[in-house]
Amino acid sequence: MRLSRYFLPILKENPKEAEIVSHRLMLRSGMIRQQSAGIYSWLPIGLKVLNKVCDIIREEQNRAGANEILMPTIQSADLWRESGRYDAYGKEMLRIQDRQERDMLFGPTNEEMVTDIFRSYVRSYKDLPLNLYHIQWKFRDEVRPRFGVMRSREFLMKDAYSFDLDYEGAKMAYYRMFVSYLRTFARVGLQAIPMRADTGPIGGDLSHEFIILAETGESQVFCDKAYLDLAVPGADTDFRNDAQLTDIVNRWTTPYAATDEMHDEADWSKVKPEDQVSARGIEVGHIFHFGTKYSEPMGAKVQGPDGKEHLVSMGSYGIGPSRLVAAAIEAFHDDAGIIWPKAIAPFGAGIVNMKPGDEGCDAVSEKIYEALTNAGVDPLLDDTDDRPGAKFATMDLIGLPTQVIVGPRGVAAGEVEIKDRKTGERQSLSVEAAINLLTAEA
């Protein structure tokens, strides 16, 4: 993409309404625009990042055996009355009526609808286990939306829902999602720590929040330093191997980890002082087993191997892709702007033509741009007439992993400069060496 043709509305000043780093940088870098309280438009560069996050989530859900569907944003109130949640949910639910005066709602979540889909088609235990997921916009009418897309009223969510014959089956479905989430966050470039969460009236221990450590985190968290060195399950993980999954979950739940709500001083005191990590954290995912909470009132049953009908045991598994984008910025930024992990960077590299109109600079910039494009690197070429200082500031702000600086002096010497956005390190290379370096990992 050429910057001269790209819609990138950069803000030079920090927006007054932005309270946290991610909100400020997302507005300044032209990723989002606020349309009303807690509601945002995603602009081209922001949407590219959001789509990359969704692609990774989708790949890992599919790898774990989940099936993608797409449920509507507008739901019938009748389904929610079946579960008993329509009147109990509160003012966060946006209730509406159609022209026939039928009660509808803008879905804040999808347990009722996915249970209705399941009960309409599945009759036998032979069709289990089953996991259905979708990535869809949600709306919750927060009293005080704040922090940009971190806590907005409209947000994108990946919801997965598992259906199993019994608790043992549901536990393995939970383990599959647990391991899938570890891989998902690692691929995005984040180190997420699973922390035991409240299970409410359901009880048991199958509820975890996935937390990333960040100075601007919304909650206090406590964990054993051992988590920082745990190896994330590899691409060769067999999601059909219950023993392997159980071993992974055990390794990732044995050391101490808790949010302030679940913190236990007695257990915490058993962790060596030098291994105690007390920090701020951001929740980026939540998985939860809720048994027959929805299958019972909605009659979601299957015939078991004993010939009798059984209520299915269910779980839900959520990741907010829009929130995850903001969380990544909170984790990876400096005073100059965003520092994107390579996997979700909007462009693979930025090419800075220091002097558009100069025959040599134009030729070298075009050569690199064409080579990177053909190799699938997806570069952004700054071919604008902005001053060099403004060009560098823009590249640092939008956080592309690598910058290729093409200037008259370097071109005369047959070289370009490569800058690593994360480390700030610079190196001068021949044009061919620069192309080889940037295309080696494509």
From Swiss-Prot:
Cleaved signal peptide residues? none
GO cellular component term, pick one: cytosol
The keyword Nucleotide-binding is annotated on this UniProt entry: yes
Q: Does the keyword Glycosyltransferase apply?
A: no
Name the major location.
cytoplasm
Q: What are the TM regions of this chain, as residue ranges? A: none
Please give the catalytic activity noted in the UniProt record. Answer: tRNA(Pro) + L-proline + ATP = L-prolyl-tRNA(Pro) + AMP + diphosphate
The subunit structure is:
Homodimer.
Quote the protein name from its UniProt record.
Proline--tRNA ligase
Gene it is expressed from: proS
